[in-house]
Curated annotation (Swiss-Prot):
SUPFAM superfamilies: PRC-barrel domain, Translation proteins. PANTHER family: RIBOSOME MATURATION FACTOR RIMM. One of its GO terms (cellular component) is cytoplasm. NCBIfam families: 16S_RimM. This is Ribosome maturation factor RimM. The PRC barrel domain binds ribosomal protein uS19. Binds ribosomal protein uS19.
């Protein structure tokens, strides 16, 4: 059984902003406002390198962040292209029926009749609804809309997704 991730990637520092050490962050989360609540984060996968957030603001789809101890453009330059991680405990609380994509990837997908369809490989996020990308046998790829009508059951603990496909969806 796949172990749950302990940390999630929430953004990538892509550039500096100004001369006083602010950085531009490309958010890797579907909830950009989660940065308002961010008190600290890990830089890269080094869980000993925890940095504190001083201030957050937004410019278009980017997050502009001031990090405690980063007070010059030279220090900020050293953070470019690094990924930001938060611990599972510090991630946002999920509503009933919501799951972290990282916990879903790799789960087995079956029909309501018990027929094996494949493995969940990706989740595409669209404004209307998400779409599950399932890799079947012989590298066939199926796109399943993430709505209750087609996906009546997701069992994170058992790592199974049950789908109720219409004709042509998985043929």
């Amino acid at each position: 059984m796949k172990e749950k991730l302990t940390h999630f990637k929430v953004g990538q520092i892509v550039n500096t902003q100004g001369l006083k050490g602010e950085v531009r962050v490309y958010p890797l989360t579907d909830d950009i406002e989660r940065f308002d609540e961010l008190k600290d984060f890990y830089l890269g996968k080094d869980l000993n390198n925890k940095l504190a957030v001083e201030k957050v603001r937004y410019k278009g789809s980017m997050v502009i962040m001031k990090i405690k101890g980063i007070d010059s453009i030279e220090k900020a330059e050293k953070l470019k292209n690094k990924f930001m991680y938060v611990s599972r405990e510090d991630s946002r609380e999920l509503e009933e029926g919501e799951f972290f994509i990282a916990d879903m990837i790799g789960m087995e997908v079956l029909t309501v009749d018990g027929k094996y369809v494949g493995i969940l490989e990706d989740v595409l996020q669209y404004s209307a609804n998400d779409v599950y990308v399932v890799k079947g046998e012989e590298d066939k790829e199926f796109m399943i809309p993430a709505i209750k009508k087609f996906v009546p059951t997701i069992d994170i603990d058992e790592r199974k997704m049950i789908i109720d496909p219409i004709k042509g969806m998985i043929d």
